[in-house]
Amino acid sequence: MEKFFSPSRHNYADLSPTDVPASEESDEALEEKQFEYFQQRQHRRLVLVNRLLAASTVALVMVSLWLGWELHTAKFGSMGSFQYGFKYELEAAKKVIKLEEYKFLGSPIFLDDGTELVPEPTPGPMKTLGVTDMYVGEPSKELDWNWNQLHWGRFFLLTEDEARQAWGPGYKEYWAENEGGYIAGLEVTHSVHCVDMLRKALRRDVYPLDSPLHGPIHTDHCLNHLRQMILCQGDLTPIPSKYYRGITDNYIFGDMPHTCRNWDSVREFITDRFNGSSAVPLAPGTVLSDPYKKLLGILDE
């Protein structure tokens, strides 16, 4: 008879931490190190990204500033431009500059019999700077009034900041005690005044000297100043000539279009600075005599 034996009984106890195999401990440590490495790597990436963003922002700002300066230089140049105002022009006046195309008038023509005359202007689409007979011809009160309107109120006061900007560190030498401030006139009205003085000098029988300050030296000053202004402006508009049978030759024809600054805007600016809302007040305590009141528009002529 076969004998069956039951398996022997064995007692099992729970494993203690010290009984865990070394391979399992090393796996956990490795996972912790990997996690720590991953966190450090992510931190380094974030730092690098932030630095790149900061550097890119700085570079973008620098490029924008550089491009802005290049565009400014291209637009204005180091000395300014005819359209936006030149370096030495009054800053406040630059804001009123507008360019216009004007057709000049007044060139003489010759008839077939040799008669010289200035024809009546024909209406056209282009603006003009006034018809010829408003400013030339036999002296008259109307003629004088037309000229006076061009340079009337040409002197006005500047603020101290404007004087400093216009004339530099030595601006205080231009203080005008009698007028109570820094008195100035724009070049355009100074030049027109000079043309008017030369017009009158040609007819001393009608316009005797009204002041010893307007004698021959002043006349020479005006002539030489206009010479310099014309050369300084250097207008490059080509002026043609036309053939006339009456003189069997060509003669200059100056009635051509020119690019100009809008005169009405400039004239309005001068008037407002002279006695309008933007006029600079006299220095406190200034007592003006009648000639200076007339000069500054406080007393009518």
Curated annotation (Swiss-Prot):
A motif (HXXHC 1) lies at residues 189-194. Disruption phenotype: Abolishes the formation of phomopsin A and leads to the accumulation an intermediate with no modified Asp moiety. Pathway: Mycotoxin biosynthesis. Its main location: membrane. A motif (HXXHC 2) lies at residues 218-222. The chain crosses the membrane at residues 47-69. One of its GO terms (cellular component) is membrane. Glycans are attached at N275. Keywords: Glycoprotein, Membrane, Oxidoreductase, Transmembrane, Transmembrane helix, Virulence. Residues 1-26 are annotated as: Disordered. It is a single-pass membrane protein. GO terms for biological process: mycotoxin biosynthetic process. Its EC number is 1.-.-.-. InterPro entries: UstYa-like. It is found in: Membrane. GO terms for molecular function: oxidoreductase activity. Belongs to the ustYa family. UstYa family oxidase; part of the gene cluster that mediates the biosynthesis of the phomopsins, a group of hexapeptide mycotoxins which infects lupins and causes lupinosis disease in livestock. Within the pathway, phomYd catalyzes the desaturation of the Asp moiety into 2,3-dehydroaspartic acid (dAsp). The pathway starts with the processing of the precursor phomA by several endopeptidases including kexin proteases as well as the cluster-specific S41 family peptidase phomP1 and the oligopeptidase phomG to produce 10 identical copies of the hexapeptide Tyr-Val-Ile-Pro-Ile-Asp. The 2 HXXHC motifs are conserved in ustYa family proteins and might form active sites. This is UstYa family oxidase phomYd. It comes from Diaporthe leptostromiformis.
